[in-house]
């Protein structure tokens, strides 16, 4: 009987220790879900970057950038003309 009480006390002690130091399963699942959502976000960002790289090589992109530079250079040319006319 004495051994039974000691074994029972040890079992209860081990259960209490395991209960107090165990990780919460829900918390682990939430962490895994966060990791999955982060991975999904990173995958989407990688796809968007790839699409952007493809866009930069397209004819539409080149015409957009050339149009932007053309407008900017035209604006600078007009500003230079105004400045030169004002100095004369």
Curated annotation (Swiss-Prot):
Pfam families: Latarcin. GO terms for cellular component: extracellular region. InterPro entries: Latarcin_precursor (IPR018802). The keyword Signal applies. Keywords: Antibiotic, Antimicrobial, Cytolysis, Fungicide, Hemolysis, Secreted, Signal, Toxin. It comes from the Eukaryota. Cleavage of the propeptide depends on the processing quadruplet motif (XXXR, with at least one of X being E). Expressed by the venom gland. Residues 23-62 form a propeptide. Its main location: secreted. GO terms for molecular function: toxin activity. It is found in: Secreted. A motif (Processing quadruplet motif) lies at residues 59-62. Residues 1-22 form the signal peptide. GO terms for biological process: defense response to bacterium; defense response to fungus; killing of cells of another organism. Has antimicrobial activity against Gram-positive bacteria (A.globiformis VKM Ac-1112 (MIC=0.5 uM), and B.subtilis VKM B-501 (MIC=1.0 uM)), Gram-negative bacteria (E.coli DH5-alpha (MIC=1.0 uM), E.coli MH1 (MIC=0.7 uM), and P.aeruginosa PAO1 (MIC=4.1 uM)), and yeasts (P.pastoris GS115 (MIC=17 uM), and S.cerevisiae Y190 (MIC>33 uM)). Has a moderate hemolytic activity against rabbit erythrocytes. Causes paralysis, but is not lethal when injected into insect (M.domestica) larvae. Belongs to the cationic peptide 03 (latarcin) family. 01 subfamily. The mature peptide (63-87) probably forms alpha-helices which disrupt target cell membranes. This is M-zodatoxin-Lt1a. It comes from Lachesana tarabaevi.
């Amino acid at each position: 009987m004495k051994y039974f009480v000691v074994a029972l006390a040890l079992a209860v002690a081990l259960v209490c220790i395991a209960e107090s130091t165990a990780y919460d399963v829900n918390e682990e699942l939430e962490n895994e879900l966060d990791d999955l959502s982060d991975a999904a976000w990173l995958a989407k960002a990688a796809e968007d970057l790839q699409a952007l790289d493809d866009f930069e090589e397209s004819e539409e992109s080149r015409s957009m950038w050339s149009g932007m530079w053309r407008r900017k250079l035209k604006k600078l040319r007009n500003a230079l003309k105004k400045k030169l006319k004002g100095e004369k």
